[in-house]
Amino acid sequence: MQANRSQDDLVKTFKAILKEERFGSQSEIVLALQAEGYGNINQSKVSRMLSKFGAVRTRNAKQEMVYCLPAELGVPTAGSPLKNLVLDVDHNQSMIVVRTSPGAAQLIARLLDSIGKPEGILGTIAGDDTIFITPSNIHEIDKTLDTVKSLFNFND
């Protein structure tokens, strides 16, 4: 039980550090966490945490490149329907386009990428509110389109 609480404390501290928007490298984050008493933290652990929480590098108010957490627009949980974030799904002969609520495209794209080739998705490119999906096989794009639509309970 103590290990879980310690992990929860680490996550809270990690998020608080990123909210400061002043750490431009993973080694700076490691040093900050070590200063907070997490002596066993290392760069690979920080790298995994940055990836897990979707941290990105962006410019802060001083125009410095720093790590920060994406804006939490009611970050979906396992219980909240992602389908509410998908506004439109369309396609042509070679690509599927998904339109999302602002800020949701990267989250949805990550989900689609995790499904991958078995469901006909070769890869995705996500902006703020638009995702381009490249199907594994353009001759089966309708099947991939149906898969994407069914994932989000999207009906025309």
Swiss-Prot record:
<dbReference type="InterPro" id="IPR020900">
    <property type="entry name" value="Arg_repress_DNA-bd"/>
</dbReference>
<dbReference type="InterPro" id="IPR036251">
    <property type="entry name" value="Arg_repress_C_sf"/>
</dbReference>
<dbReference type="GO" id="GO:1900079">
    <property type="term" value="P:regulation of arginine biosynthetic process"/>
</dbReference>
<comment type="pathway">
    <text>Amino-acid biosynthesis; L-arginine biosynthesis [regulation].</text>
</comment>
<keyword id="KW-0028">Amino-acid biosynthesis</keyword>
<keyword id="KW-0055">Arginine biosynthesis</keyword>
<comment type="similarity">
    <text>Belongs to the ArgR family.</text>
</comment>
<keyword id="KW-0238">DNA-binding</keyword>
<keyword id="KW-0805">Transcription regulation</keyword>
<dbReference type="Pfam" id="PF02863">
    <property type="entry name" value="Arg_repressor_C"/>
</dbReference>
<keyword id="KW-0963">Cytoplasm</keyword>
<dbReference type="GO" id="GO:0034618">
    <property type="term" value="F:arginine binding"/>
</dbReference>
<dbReference type="GO" id="GO:0051259">
    <property type="term" value="P:protein complex oligomerization"/>
</dbReference>
<dbReference type="InterPro" id="IPR001669">
    <property type="entry name" value="Arg_repress"/>
</dbReference>
<comment type="function">
    <text>Regulates arginine biosynthesis genes.</text>
</comment>
<keyword id="KW-0678">Repressor</keyword>
<dbReference type="Pfam" id="PF01316">
    <property type="entry name" value="Arg_repressor"/>
</dbReference>
<dbReference type="InterPro" id="IPR020899">
    <property type="entry name" value="Arg_repress_C"/>
</dbReference>
<protein>
    <recommendedName>
        <fullName>Arginine repressor</fullName>
    </recommendedName>
</protein>
<dbReference type="InterPro" id="IPR036388">
    <property type="entry name" value="WH-like_DNA-bd_sf"/>
</dbReference>
<dbReference type="GO" id="GO:0003700">
    <property type="term" value="F:DNA-binding transcription factor activity"/>
</dbReference>
<dbReference type="GO" id="GO:0003677">
    <property type="term" value="F:DNA binding"/>
</dbReference>
<dbReference type="GO" id="GO:0005737">
    <property type="term" value="C:cytoplasm"/>
</dbReference>
<dbReference type="InterPro" id="IPR036390">
    <property type="entry name" value="WH_DNA-bd_sf"/>
</dbReference>
<dbReference type="GO" id="GO:0006526">
    <property type="term" value="P:L-arginine biosynthetic process"/>
</dbReference>
<keyword id="KW-0804">Transcription</keyword>
